[in-house]
UniProtKB/Swiss-Prot annotation:
Annotated protein name in UniProt: F420-dependent glucose-6-phosphate dehydrogenase
Gene this chain is encoded by: fgd
Residues the record lists as binding coenzyme F420-(gamma-Glu)n: D41, T78, T109, G110, N114, S177, G178, A180, A181
Pfam families: Bac_luciferase
Molecular function as annotated in GO: coenzyme F420 binding; glucose-6-phosphate dehydrogenase (coenzyme F420) activity; oxidoreductase activity, acting on paired donors, with incorporation or reduction of molecular oxygen
SUPFAM superfamilies: Bacterial luciferase-like
Chain positions recorded as substrate binding sites: T195, K198, K259, R283
Reaction(s) catalysed (UniProt annotation): oxidized coenzyme F420-(gamma-L-Glu)(n) + D-glucose 6-phosphate + H(+) = 6-phospho-D-glucono-1,5-lactone + reduced coenzyme F420-(gamma-L-Glu)(n)
Organism phylogeny: Bacteria, Bacillati, Actinomycetota, Actinomycetes, Nakamurellales
Length: 339
């Protein structure tokens, strides 16, 4: 089997822009040479002021109609609490039928701020993981069978059929930041998603070994999977501007214990705004020099990630896309032999 090609994608900042502007940015990403566009699926954003949270499912359908070649997917959607897995199976089968070969379902265990505000219980991590595993198995069954009766611990179906589905099932990627979900991705998923800007040892000593372990236990090869790194990058010709742009996304620099149990965007915003700019920017590759920027990105290619999806924090995303299209993507493609 041929390994997936190296791809460079764009993360549409759904927590920062409304749906129409975000769709325009996705179209621009294709025009500037990006290979994919991924969107999160939040009910609520990380901050209240200036925050947005468009629904990913209608947005993907609309953007599919306005683009020609980019892969479109979620990074990530939680198919376990506010959605029944069967609803997600139907939605992505429809998207896959309309845009064959271009749709990816990226899933994860989720965030409490997207579930608790709807009056839904937020389970412990062990249950969230079990729900994710069961939901992926159910989605696979619904995509390959007919009149599916499923009796799981958390979900059930009774002679359910997804009537409209693509010739080839939509790939499922599992997002993870810990070993258990990463191992699960290696066992049952078509791809693995994680995020940049954390301790290097997390990738070298924990996540990648867990991924290889899952792949080997399933009798698969690692190069059968698409390994996607969501890259946190802030690139501008003005380094100070690149640094200050990270402020909007300061919540990403909060430690897990700092944001545990925080479901209100106003409270998340308050906590994030207390961080000094150096900490707010700590997850991001902040650069004004293209060669320096590419060299830092190269670290993740050297780890073996084959699909880098770039998430920029600034408010002027058209500027980012133009700068990346002109200065960064050509260097990256030359680096991997695509120039």
């Amino acid at each position: 089997m041929t390994p997936p090609p190296i791809r460079f994608g764009y993360k549409a900042s759904a927590e920062q822009f409304g749906p129409s502007e975000l769709a325009d940015l996705a179209v621009a990403a294709e025009e500037h040479g990006f290979d994919s566009v991924f969107i999160s699926d939040h009910l609520q954003p990380w901050r209240h002021d200036g925050g947005h949270a468009p629904a990913s499912l209608p947005w993907l359908g609309a953007v599919g109609a306005r683009t020609q070649r980019v892969i479109l997917g979620t990074s990530v959607l939680t198919p376990t609490i506010r959605y029944h897995p069967g609803v997600i199976a139907q939605a992505f089968a429809t998207l896959g039928s309309m845009y064959p070969g271009r749709i990816v379902l990226g899933v994860g265990t989720g965030e409490s701020l997207n579930e608790v505000p709807l009056g839904l219980a937020w389970p412990e991590q062990k249950e969230r993981f079990a729900r994710l595993k069961e939901s992926v198995n159910l989605i696979h069954e619904l995509w390959t069978g007919e009149r599916v009766t499923f009796e799981g611990e958390y979900y059930r179906t009774d002679k359910a059929t997804i009537y409209d589905r693509p010739a080839d099932p939509v790939p499922i990627y599992i997002g993870a930041s810990g070993p258990a979900a990463t191992r699960l991705a290696g066992r049952i998923a078509d791809g693995f998603i994680t995020t940049s800007g954390k301790a290097p040892s997390l990738y070298t000593d924990t996540l990648l070994p867990a991924l290889r372990d899952g792949v080997e236990k399933a009798g698969r090869r690692l190069d059968e999977l698409d390994t996607l790194m969501e890259m946190k990058v802030s690139f501008d010709t003005d380094r100070e501007r690149a640094m200050q742009d990270t402020r909007f996304w300061a919540a990403l620099a909060l430690k897990p214990e700092q944001k545990a149990g925080v479901e209100d965007p106003l409270e998340m915003q308050r906590l994030a705004d207390e961080l000094p700019i150096e900490q707010a920017a700590s997850r991001w590759i902040v650069s004004d020099d293209p060669d320096e920027h590419v060299e830092k990105i190269r670290t993740y290619l050297d780890l073996g990630f084959r699909h880098l999806v770039f998430h920029a924090p600034g408010h002027d995303q058209q500027r980012f896309l133009a700068l990346y299209g002109e200065q960064i993507l050509p260097r990256l493609r030359a680096l991997v032999g695509q120039g």
